Amino acid sequence: MDNKIVYVVSDSVGETADLVVRAAMGQFPFAPDIRRVPYVEDTGTLKEVISIAKSNQALICFTLVKPDMRQYLVTEAAREGVEAYDIIGPLIDQIEEITGQVPRYEPGVVRRLDEEYFKKIEAIEFAVKYDDGRDARGILKADIVLIGVSRTSKTPLSQYLAHNKRLKVANVPLVPEVDPPEELYQVAKEKCFGLKITPDKLNHIRKERLKSLGLSDGATYANINRIQEEIDHFEEVISKINCQVIDVSNKAIEETANIIVNAVQNQKMF
């Protein structure tokens, strides 16, 4: 049975069927000749594959999610005396029977899920790499640029947008003593969002932060005059960029994220 031909037929890429066939064939001391037939959308293609399989005395293994296509292949293969094995159909039917839910019958769902997963990972890695202004080059590469003084939730918001919306987010901290990176004035203003906060709220947040670190809440970092100076600098920079400003004083991360997502969707940026 050396070089037994196996046709892997799928209405998508065929990776699932290919992996299952290789795993099964690995239990036998012969090397199969696996030939993938992807993106099958019509019975004409199935009929052709059956004919070729018959002439080569080959086996057909398939993952077709649509019931009519599955039934056609099984019926026609049996009529021609060709062995055909349905890899995914019986499991779909069993799950439907157990759960009472109707399948979507959409080809390529696994591949789309994989692509979404990798987009998420890429976005998360981007958020880490370009967090807190570490590398200004990320500003021009980002989908979203967050701008704000310290403790305005730039980092957790960046991570939330990466995890849940698969957006690549860079964030830039503003302090009066350091000039903003030039890239901040080069990026499209529609991608930029200034995170505004009231002095009193920021004063409270910073004092709590210092306490959690075991430091005195009387440090300059939490001084109300210093905070006002930082906010004035923030407003000056934002006025030059002319981007949207979101008051995060009393907003949860999720709420701010939704405002940003709605804004970019309305602008049809992605």
UniProtKB/Swiss-Prot annotation:
PANTHER family: PYRUVATE, PHOSPHATE DIKINASE REGULATORY PROTEIN 1, CHLOROPLASTIC. GO terms for molecular function: ADP binding; ATP binding; phosphotransferase activity, phosphate group as acceptor; protein serine/threonine kinase activity. It holds the Pfam family Kinase-PPPase. It catalyses: N(tele)-phospho-L-histidyl/L-threonyl-[pyruvate, phosphate dikinase] + ADP = N(tele)-phospho-L-histidyl/O-phospho-L-threonyl-[pyruvate, phosphate dikinase] + AMP + H(+); N(tele)-phospho-L-histidyl/O-phospho-L-threonyl-[pyruvate, phosphate dikinase] + phosphate + H(+) = N(tele)-phospho-L-histidyl/L-threonyl-[pyruvate, phosphate dikinase] + diphosphate. ADP binds at G148, V149, S150, R151, T152, S153, K154, T155. Transmembrane segments: none annotated. This is Putative pyruvate, phosphate dikinase regulatory protein. Belongs to the pyruvate, phosphate/water dikinase regulatory protein family. PDRP subfamily. Keywords: Kinase, Nucleotide-binding, Serine/threonine-protein kinase, Transferase. Bifunctional serine/threonine kinase and phosphorylase involved in the regulation of the pyruvate, phosphate dikinase (PPDK) by catalyzing its phosphorylation/dephosphorylation. Its EC number is 2.7.11.32, 2.7.4.27. It comes from the Bacteria. NCBIfam families: PRK05339.1.
